[in-house]
Amino acid sequence: MAQQLYFSRDSKLYAEFDNQVWEIPVLDGFSFSQSTNTSDITLAEMQGSDGISRRGRRLFTDSLAPAEWSFSTYVRPFYSGSEHHAVEEILWAVMAGADKFGTVSSAGSIDAVALTTDTATDREQGTYVVDADDTTYSGSAGTGATFQISVNSSGTANAIQVVSGGTDYTASETFTVPAALVGGGTGTLTVTISTVDAGSSYAFYRNANVDANSDFGEFVSMPTDTNNSINFGQSNRSVLADLNLYFVMETSTSKPMVYKLENAAVNEASIDFDVDGIATINWSGFAKNIKDRQSAGDVIANTTAFSSQAGTVGQIHLKTDSDMQFSLFTSTGTGTGVTAIDSGVDSTANFIRNRLTQAIVSTTDTAAFGSGDYYLTLTGGNVTISNNITYLVPEELGNVNIPIEGVTGGRTVTGNFTCYLTLDTAGADKGSSVDLFNDMTESGAGLDKVVNDFQVTFQIGGATSGDPRLYINMPKVHIDVPVHSVEDVISVETGFGAYTNDFDKADEFVLTYYGDTTTANQVSYP
């Protein structure tokens, strides 16, 4: 009898959430597994009068352990002509607390702003990310906006762009920005809203038990014509929404193997950006069970169009003459289900080159950190976001217990970045890596800070408008003393952790995706 083998290089991954399915290309090295938890009993007694000492062991299966999975994806933003999205955004949304996906109104999200002419000439040159909550806002309804303001070498603020558009704003409303947020100097800045979005977007949001403390309202991911800002404002809860993952091995077109990871929880995402690579995210998490859908008879593989294919709820249809197009029956009938969204999957224009990545490190505490702003050219880095999930498994005797659900622990945002050891020959406090080390280790200054307060932004892929890129903005960051690494070129590695001043809010960081807006590289969604 012939035996069918399956190869990892023939594999694809699909994610099911809220009656919709997305295709997510993964890299080599993905894994998923599930084992059992066992206990053993051993005998250990002394020798009897007959010279016999009983020795033995008995094993018991206590429970089925939760499934563990991991895979890597590239960071792949794209632009649909009206909205910015990312191939992997479904994973972020579930990790960040969303429980719904659909078309929602994006009215009031800021599309464009104008910066009133700045008369100051004494601001510190640099790029500053400003949260609207730290400004004086002329309106009352808007929330969640973030801007990036640039100060030129003349000490004048001369450029602004929207990082996060927020919600419920109105054109002509203003923000008065304190000088301390834009390099100090003379006078405040005024930012005026030019236009706001009036349409609708395919968004991920929180529907049940919305956390009113979130600065971003119910929205977790709100794509607009400007960008796609993803926040964790709805993630302050003990149990997050889950999704189903499908690993499809297409080695055989007649008998493709499909493993379903039920009730999967996204635990950790680690973003890596080394100088010679493509921006990558390493994902890991848990699931309740791993089910073989092929052996269960729930995989239909043929050339029939899904709209004409009959099936029952939960069955999977793979169209063999259309690159094994994945469809899922959400109810029993003919064509009663959804076909996987594959927007951006086939594009070659949405990969991000790490070599263009920039880091902006700044603080308003110039008494302790004399440079205030540090301009660091990176050679690599990492940001890791973790929900620290543990899976609950009962421990009843006499039963093989089954995993119940994952429970979150403390949310952590940590990472590191590396750069060459550089000294600005023009003098001290010029924002070089040497200045950062000296400021952090100087007694009576940075060394005396139990908790230091930096704002850190990684511009992965650079800052050129229209190019694919990902910004990671962390408003409050505690930075460790840089560690020297002695190699051919001396470098320093700096660890950090983002934190919040208000434990009622999940505001440690915001991710902002920008797709390639070149007309030829736009793709439809969904």
Task: Locate each region found by the language model.
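Signature of extracytoplasmic/envelope-associated structural regions
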Residues: 1-109, 199-526
